[in-house]
Curated annotation (Swiss-Prot):
<comment type="similarity">
    <text>Belongs to the RnpA family.</text>
</comment>
<dbReference type="GO" id="GO:0030677">
    <property type="term" value="C:ribonuclease P complex"/>
</dbReference>
<keyword id="KW-0694">RNA-binding</keyword>
<dbReference type="InterPro" id="IPR014721">
    <property type="entry name" value="Ribsml_uS5_D2-typ_fold_subgr"/>
</dbReference>
<dbReference type="InterPro" id="IPR000100">
    <property type="entry name" value="RNase_P"/>
</dbReference>
<keyword id="KW-0378">Hydrolase</keyword>
<keyword id="KW-0255">Endonuclease</keyword>
<dbReference type="GO" id="GO:0042781">
    <property type="term" value="F:3'-tRNA processing endoribonuclease activity"/>
</dbReference>
<dbReference type="InterPro" id="IPR020568">
    <property type="entry name" value="Ribosomal_Su5_D2-typ_SF"/>
</dbReference>
<protein>
    <recommendedName>
        <fullName>Ribonuclease P protein component</fullName>
        <ecNumber>3.1.26.5</ecNumber>
    </recommendedName>
</protein>
<dbReference type="InterPro" id="IPR020539">
    <property type="entry name" value="RNase_P_CS"/>
</dbReference>
<keyword id="KW-0540">Nuclease</keyword>
<comment type="function">
    <text>RNaseP catalyzes the removal of the 5'-leader sequence from pre-tRNA to produce the mature 5'-terminus. It can also cleave other RNA substrates such as 4.5S RNA. The protein component plays an auxiliary but essential role in vivo by binding to the 5'-leader sequence and broadening the substrate specificity of the ribozyme.</text>
</comment>
<dbReference type="GO" id="GO:0000049">
    <property type="term" value="F:tRNA binding"/>
</dbReference>
<comment type="subunit">
    <text>Consists of a catalytic RNA component (M1 or rnpB) and a protein subunit.</text>
</comment>
<dbReference type="GO" id="GO:0004526">
    <property type="term" value="F:ribonuclease P activity"/>
</dbReference>
<keyword id="KW-0819">tRNA processing</keyword>
C-alpha cells in the first residue's frame, strides 16, 4: 500500500540535514524554483524548504508556497529516488500564478523519478 504521509521523518529539520544536501547536490532549476537533491541511505525521500523573506515579502505568500511544495511532494514521493531534497524559492516565483508554479514544480520533480 502506498503511503501519502508527510510526517516528521520525511522532513529535513536539523542544519546537519541541510548541510548534507548542500555539500554536493544534484541541482535542477528553473527561473522560479531550484531543487537540490542528494541520495540518502534511507528507504524514503525527505524534503526541506527554503523560502526567504528577501525573496517573498509577505508571510501569507511564503506559507502558501510552502504548503504547495509540501502537497506536491506528498503526492509524488513514492515515485522519487530515495534522496534528500531542498527546494529553494526565488524572488521571481511571485510573478507567476500558483497554478503555474505547481506545474513547474511537477516538471522539476520528474528529473528525480526512479
Amino acid at each position: 500500500m502506498i503511503e501519502f504521509y508527510f510526517n516528521k521523518k520525511r522532513r529535513l529539520i536539523t542544519p546537519n540535514d541541510f548541510n548534507y544536501v548542500f555539500k554536493s547536490p544534484n541541482v535542477i532549476r528553473c527561473k522560479e524554483i531550484t531543487i537540490l537533491g542528494r541520495l540518502n541511505l534511507l528507504s524514503f525521500s525527505r524534503l526541506g524548504i527554503s523560502v526567504s523573506r528577501k525573496n517573498v515579502k509577505y508571510a501569507y505568500q511564503r506559507n502558501k508556497i510552502k504548503r504547495l511544495i509540501r502537497e506536491n511532494f506528498r503526492i509524488i514521493q513514492h515515485r522519487l529516488v530515495s534522496s534528500d531534497f531542498v527546494v529553494i524559492v526565488n524572488s521571481s516565483s511571485m510573478q507567476i500564478s500558483f497554478k503555474l508554479l505547481a506545474k513547474k514544480l511537477e516538471n522539476l520533480w520528474s528529473y528525480y523519478y526512479q
